[in-house]
Amino acid sequence: MPPRELSEAEPPPLRAPTPPPRRRSAPPELGIKCVLVGDGAVGKSSLIVSYTCNGYPARYRPTALDTFSVQVLVDGAPVRIELWDTAGQEDFDRLRSLCYPDTDVFLACFSVVQPSSFQNITEKWLPEIRTHNPQAPVLLVGTQADLRDDVNVLIQLDQGGREGPVPQPQAQGLAEKIRACCYLECSALTQKNLKEVFDSAILSAIEHKARLEKKLNAKGVRTLSRCRWKKFFCFV
């Protein structure tokens, strides 16, 4: 049949609407909880502020408990990292321990120019962490690295009869002893190695979560296999 011409009064045939192109769904955002622990005044808050806000606090302000949230991309996938800034004073021991159980990674911080804060890593902070969270990875972080060679700081340490700055090999040795993922020194003021610290924390947390998920899946498979085995014998 030859094509038919439409009259002016006859409406054109309706066409099915073209569906819009499908958009690829964004990958789900992975959440990571990172808790910073360490003595008061070692620079935990400064690390977080410098990393998240690209700034440096003008003066020291003791922290009870603060949280910061940052989104980063890891291999193109979005990751939301929550940074928990805890107080190092004994008055906040009970409050601080409440945030430990569901933590994905810890940053155990000490100041390289405060030897007592380094000593407290093994005497206070690691035991406290492991009491409430025995599995999460720990990174040992030496803060205030810009003061290691500061003349005024060295004079104050000498006049006060205190030890000098914590040697890097000693800190590295402690990291190996406590089975920390690594030891890193950084400066919130100059931001030297600052990004490396949090990058390492994020990657350590992701690897830890992947291991837990793999272990959980393997446990589920074993449980399912045992159930089927029991049912098999019941039918026999």
From Swiss-Prot:
<dbReference type="GO" id="GO:0007015">
    <property type="term" value="P:actin filament organization"/>
</dbReference>
<feature type="binding site">
    <location>
        <begin position="85"/>
        <end position="89"/>
    </location>
    <ligand>
        <name>GTP</name>
    </ligand>
</feature>
<feature type="binding site">
    <location>
        <begin position="143"/>
        <end position="146"/>
    </location>
    <ligand>
        <name>GTP</name>
    </ligand>
</feature>
<dbReference type="GO" id="GO:0007165">
    <property type="term" value="P:signal transduction"/>
</dbReference>
<feature type="lipid moiety-binding region" description="S-palmitoyl cysteine">
    <location>
        <position position="234"/>
    </location>
</feature>
<feature type="compositionally biased region" description="Pro residues">
    <location>
        <begin position="10"/>
        <end position="20"/>
    </location>
</feature>
<keyword id="KW-0342">GTP-binding</keyword>
<dbReference type="GO" id="GO:0046872">
    <property type="term" value="F:metal ion binding"/>
</dbReference>
<keyword id="KW-0479">Metal-binding</keyword>
<feature type="region of interest" description="Disordered">
    <location>
        <begin position="1"/>
        <end position="27"/>
    </location>
</feature>
<dbReference type="GO" id="GO:0019901">
    <property type="term" value="F:protein kinase binding"/>
</dbReference>
<feature type="binding site">
    <location>
        <begin position="38"/>
        <end position="45"/>
    </location>
    <ligand>
        <name>GTP</name>
    </ligand>
</feature>
<dbReference type="Pfam" id="PF00071">
    <property type="entry name" value="Ras"/>
</dbReference>
<dbReference type="GO" id="GO:0010008">
    <property type="term" value="C:endosome membrane"/>
</dbReference>
<dbReference type="GO" id="GO:0005886">
    <property type="term" value="C:plasma membrane"/>
</dbReference>
<protein>
    <recommendedName>
        <fullName>Rho-related GTP-binding protein RhoV</fullName>
    </recommendedName>
</protein>
<dbReference type="InterPro" id="IPR001806">
    <property type="entry name" value="Small_GTPase"/>
</dbReference>
<keyword id="KW-0472">Membrane</keyword>
<keyword id="KW-0597">Phosphoprotein</keyword>
<feature type="modified residue" description="Phosphoserine">
    <location>
        <position position="25"/>
    </location>
</feature>
<keyword id="KW-0564">Palmitate</keyword>
<keyword id="KW-0460">Magnesium</keyword>
<keyword id="KW-0547">Nucleotide-binding</keyword>
<dbReference type="InterPro" id="IPR005225">
    <property type="entry name" value="Small_GTP-bd"/>
</dbReference>
<dbReference type="GO" id="GO:0007264">
    <property type="term" value="P:small GTPase-mediated signal transduction"/>
</dbReference>
<keyword id="KW-0449">Lipoprotein</keyword>
<comment type="function">
    <text>Plays a role in the control of the actin cytoskeleton via activation of the JNK pathway.</text>
</comment>
<dbReference type="GO" id="GO:0005525">
    <property type="term" value="F:GTP binding"/>
</dbReference>
<dbReference type="InterPro" id="IPR027417">
    <property type="entry name" value="P-loop_NTPase"/>
</dbReference>
<keyword id="KW-0967">Endosome</keyword>
<dbReference type="GO" id="GO:0030010">
    <property type="term" value="P:establishment of cell polarity"/>
</dbReference>
<dbReference type="GO" id="GO:0003924">
    <property type="term" value="F:GTPase activity"/>
</dbReference>
<keyword id="KW-1003">Cell membrane</keyword>
<dbReference type="GO" id="GO:0006897">
    <property type="term" value="P:endocytosis"/>
</dbReference>
<comment type="subunit">
    <text>Interacts with PAK2.</text>
</comment>
<dbReference type="InterPro" id="IPR003578">
    <property type="entry name" value="Small_GTPase_Rho"/>
</dbReference>
<comment type="similarity">
    <text>Belongs to the small GTPase superfamily. Rho family.</text>
</comment>
